[in-house]
C-alpha cells in the first residue's frame, strides 16, 4: 500500500546527545513540553500514592518517567525533581535504608557487571510495593513503606492484616530487619503471556484504602534482603523458609555467569509463577554491613528487566495511504522503538474517521504493542503534545474504479494497484514489491497499470537501483506474465469477484465476460445483488474497456478477437 508522501506533516527531526534521542524543537517548546509532562507525571504520582488509585498503567508511567529524564538531559536540566518516586511525606525512619537497584540494559551489561566476582544469586524481580518489616523479641513491631528509602509511611496495622506475613519469628529472625516486596498473589501467572496486570497499582490501592481490609489477604510477601543476616546465602534462605518466608528460597538460584542469569530470566518469564515480575535481580553473595546502605548506592545488586509488552513511542509524522480500492488509511510514523526483536517505525491507525477520533498529532506519545504475526498495533494515546498541527487528509474522491491510469492525484492508489497485480492473487510477479514498482514508474512514467508490458530489457536495466541480476529477473517475470490465463489478468484488473466466483463463471475471454448479465453474476458463489451490480459497473467503465483493448494489442490470452 503506497504512502501519500506529499501529505506528510510535521516531521520531527531527532539527534543524539549523550546517548539519548533528543527532539529538535525550539527551546521554548522543549521547555514547555518538559514542564507539561512533568506536571502530568506529578499528578498521576499524587493520585497513586495518596489515593491508591492508578490513573495510568504502571509500565506507561515508568516509560514516560524515563522519557522525561531523557528530555531533561537533552537540554541540561536538573533531573532530581522528576516525580518518579513517591512523595517524601513519610515520617517513620527505616532502621536500614532501601538502596534501590541499578538497571542493566542487556546480557553484555550483566556480564560486565559480574566480571571480577565469582558467587551470585538471581531472583525474580517481583512487581509490587517495597516494605520494611521489623521484628523485635519475636514479634512484628513495625512495617514501613519504602518512601524515599530513608523514611516511609507506617503500615504496621495494614501489614498485620495480611495473613501470609508471619507475625512472629524465632531464632536469628526474632530480632531482625527484613526488606521485601508486597505482591498480589496469583495462580499460574505467566509473565510473557499475561503481562503486568497493573499489579503494583492494585497492591498500593489495597494498602492505602481505609476500608475493605479483607482484600489484604490476597497479598503476599517476597523477602529480598535480610540486612546483617547470615553471611552464607544458603543458610540465610533456609532460615527465612523455616520462618514462613518460603518463596525466597524457592525462587533464588546460585549463578556464576551471565548465561546462567539469562537462562533463569527466560525460565521465569515463560513459567507459571505466583506473582507478577518485571525482570530479575542479580545479587552478589557478599554484601556490606547495613550501616553502609544508602538510597541509590546498592552496588552489590542489579536488575535486568524484561522488555515491556507494549512500548511508548513518539509520533514523528502522520501519513496517508490509498489502497487499490480507494480506501484511505492513516499511518503514524514513529521514533523507532524495539518490541521483542522487532524495530517498530510505523503503526497503522486505520481510517481517517478513526484517526480523528484518536486525535493523534506529531509529538504525541502512543502505546504500541505487537498483534498477531508481529504486526504493530496502536493501543492508546498516553500523552498529547501541546501543539496540535495535523495534516489534511486527501479528498474522498477515490473508489474502486479510480486510478487505473496514472495522474498526479492518483499516485498512491496507482502504486497500490501495481502492487496488487504483482501479488500472488493476481499475476504473481516474484520480486516486484512496492519499492520496485515505484522505481519503475518514476523512471518510465507509466500511462496505466499495464504499461510495464511495453518495457524493453534495456529500459528495465537502466532503472536506478536495479542491479543486473534483478533487471534480468524482472524481465523474465514480465515475459512469463504474458502466459498467465485470462482469469489472472482479470483479477489484475481488480474485477470485484472472488477467485472462486470467477472460476465458477467459467469465462475464458473478454468477449464472454461482456455477454454476462447481472443475473449470471448473482448466481456465483459469494455474489449477491450488490456485488453483481459492481461487476457490471466495472465491466462498463471506459478505463477498463480501454485497458482490455490495450491488452488485446499486446496479444494477452483471452483479450484478442
Swiss-Prot record:
<dbReference type="GO" id="GO:0003911">
    <property type="term" value="F:DNA ligase (NAD+) activity"/>
</dbReference>
<keyword id="KW-0520">NAD</keyword>
<dbReference type="GO" id="GO:0006260">
    <property type="term" value="P:DNA replication"/>
</dbReference>
<keyword id="KW-0436">Ligase</keyword>
<comment type="function">
    <text>Catalyzes the formation of phosphodiester linkages between 5'-phosphoryl and 3'-hydroxyl groups in double-stranded DNA using NAD as a coenzyme and as the energy source for the reaction.</text>
</comment>
<keyword id="KW-0234">DNA repair</keyword>
<comment type="similarity">
    <text>Belongs to the NAD-dependent DNA ligase family. LigB subfamily.</text>
</comment>
<dbReference type="GO" id="GO:0006281">
    <property type="term" value="P:DNA repair"/>
</dbReference>
<keyword id="KW-0227">DNA damage</keyword>
<keyword id="KW-0235">DNA replication</keyword>
<protein>
    <recommendedName>
        <fullName>DNA ligase B</fullName>
        <ecNumber>6.5.1.2</ecNumber>
    </recommendedName>
</protein>
<feature type="active site" description="N6-AMP-lysine intermediate">
    <location>
        <position position="125"/>
    </location>
</feature>
<dbReference type="InterPro" id="IPR012340">
    <property type="entry name" value="NA-bd_OB-fold"/>
</dbReference>
<dbReference type="Pfam" id="PF03120">
    <property type="entry name" value="DNA_ligase_OB"/>
</dbReference>
<dbReference type="InterPro" id="IPR050326">
    <property type="entry name" value="NAD_dep_DNA_ligaseB"/>
</dbReference>
<dbReference type="InterPro" id="IPR020923">
    <property type="entry name" value="DNA_ligase_B"/>
</dbReference>
<dbReference type="InterPro" id="IPR018239">
    <property type="entry name" value="DNA_ligase_AS"/>
</dbReference>
<dbReference type="InterPro" id="IPR013840">
    <property type="entry name" value="DNAligase_N"/>
</dbReference>
<dbReference type="Pfam" id="PF01653">
    <property type="entry name" value="DNA_ligase_aden"/>
</dbReference>
<dbReference type="InterPro" id="IPR004150">
    <property type="entry name" value="NAD_DNA_ligase_OB"/>
</dbReference>
<dbReference type="InterPro" id="IPR010994">
    <property type="entry name" value="RuvA_2-like"/>
</dbReference>
<dbReference type="InterPro" id="IPR013839">
    <property type="entry name" value="DNAligase_adenylation"/>
</dbReference>
Amino acid at each position: 500500500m503506497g504512502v501519500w508522501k506529499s501529505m506528510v506533516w510535521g516531521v520531527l527531526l531527532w539527534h543524539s546527545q549523550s546517548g539519548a534521542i533528543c527532539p529538535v524543537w525550539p527551546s521554548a517548546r522543549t521547555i514547555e513540553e518538559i514542564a507539561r509532562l512533568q506536571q502530568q507525571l506529578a499528578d498521576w504520582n499524587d493520585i497513586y500514592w495518596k489515593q491508591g488509585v492508578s490513573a495510568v498503567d504502571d509500565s506507561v508511567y515508568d516509560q514516560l518517567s524515563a522519557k522525561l529524564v531523557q528530555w531533561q538531559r537533552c537540554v541540561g536540566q536538573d533531573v532530581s525533581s522528576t516525580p518518579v518516586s513517591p512523595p517524601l511525606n513519610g515520617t517513620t525512619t527505616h532502621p536500614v535504608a532501601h538502596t534501590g537497584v541499578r538497571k542493566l540494559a542487556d546480557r553484555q551489561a550483566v556480564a560486565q557487571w559480574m566480571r571480577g566476582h565469582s558467587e551470585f544469586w538471581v531472583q525474580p524481580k517481583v512487581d509490587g510495593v517495597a516494605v520494611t518489616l521489623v521484628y523485635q523479641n519475636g514479634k512484628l513491631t513495625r512495617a514501613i513503606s519504602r518512601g524515599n528509602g530513608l523514611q516511609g509511611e507506617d503500615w504496621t496495622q495494614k501489614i498485620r492484616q495480611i495473613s501470609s506475613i508471619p507475625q512472629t519469628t524465632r531464632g536469628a529472625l526474632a530480632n531482625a530487619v527484613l526488606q521485601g516486596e508486597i505482591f498480589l498473589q496469583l495462580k499460574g501467572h505467566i509473565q510473557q503471556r499475561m503481562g503486568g496486570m497493573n499489579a503494583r497499582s492494585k497492591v498500593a490501592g489495597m494498602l492505602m484504602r481505609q476500608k475493605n481490609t479483607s482484600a489484604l489477604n490476597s497479598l503476599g510477601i517476597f523477602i529480598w534482603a535480610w540486612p546483617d543476616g547470615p553471611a552464607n546465602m544458603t543458610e540465610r534462605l533456609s532460615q527465612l523458609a523455616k520462618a514462613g518466608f518460603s518463596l525466597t528460597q524457592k525462587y533464588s538460584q546460585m549463578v556464576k555467569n551471565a548465561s546462567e542469569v539469562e537462562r533463569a530470566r527466560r525460565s521465569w518469564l515463560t513459567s507459571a509463577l505466583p506473582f507478577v515480575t518485571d525482570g530479575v535481580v542479580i545479587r552478589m553473595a557478599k554484601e556490606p554491613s547495613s550501616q553502609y546502605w544508602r538510597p541509590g548506592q546498592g552496588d552489590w545488586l542489579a536488575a535486568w528487566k524484561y522488555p515491556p509488552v507494549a512500548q511508548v513511542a513518539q509520533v514523528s509524522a502522520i501519513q496517508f495511504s490509498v489502497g487499490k480500492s480507494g480506501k484511505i488509511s492513516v499511518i503514524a510514523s514513529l521514533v523507532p522503538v524495539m518490541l521483542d526483536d522487532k524495530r517498530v517505525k510505523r503503526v497503522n491507525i486505520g481510517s481517517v474517521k478513526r484517526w480523528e477520533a484518536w486525535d493523534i498529532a506529531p509529538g504525541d506519545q502512543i502505546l504500541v504493542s505487537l498483534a498477531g504475526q508481529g504486526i504493530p498495533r496502536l493501543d492508546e494515546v498516553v500523552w498529547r503534545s501541546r501543539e496540535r498541527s495535523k495534516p489534511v487528509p486527501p479528498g474522498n474522491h477515490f473508489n474502486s474504479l479510480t486510478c487505473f491510469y496514472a495522474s498526479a492525484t492518483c499516485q498512491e492508489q496507482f502504486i497500490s494497484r501495481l502492487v496488487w497485480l504483482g501479488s500472488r492473487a493476481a499475476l504473481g510477479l516474484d520480486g516486484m514489491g512496492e519499492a520496485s514498482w515505484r522505481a519503475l514508474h518514476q523512471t518510465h512514467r507509466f500511462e496505466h497499470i499495464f504499461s510495464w508490458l511495453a518495457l524493453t530489457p534495456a529500459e528495465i536495466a537502466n532503472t536506478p537501483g536495479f542491479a543486473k541480476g534483478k533487471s534480468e529477473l524482472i524481465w523474465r517475470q514480465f515475459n512469463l506474465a504474458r502466459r498467465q490465463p485470462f482469469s489472472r489478468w482479470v483479477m489484475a484488473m481488480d474485477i470485484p469477484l472472488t477467485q472462486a466466483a470467477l472460476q465458477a463463471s467459467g469465462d475464458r475471454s473478454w468477449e464472454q465476460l461482456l455477454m454476462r448479465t447481472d443475473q449470471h453474476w448473482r448466481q456465483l458463489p459469494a455474489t449477491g445483488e450488490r456485488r453483481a451490480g459492481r461487476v457490471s459497473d466495472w465491466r462498463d467503465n471506459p478505463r477498463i474497456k480501454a485497458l482490455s483493448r490495450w491488452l488485446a494489442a499486446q496479444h494477452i490470452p483471452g483479450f484478442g478477437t
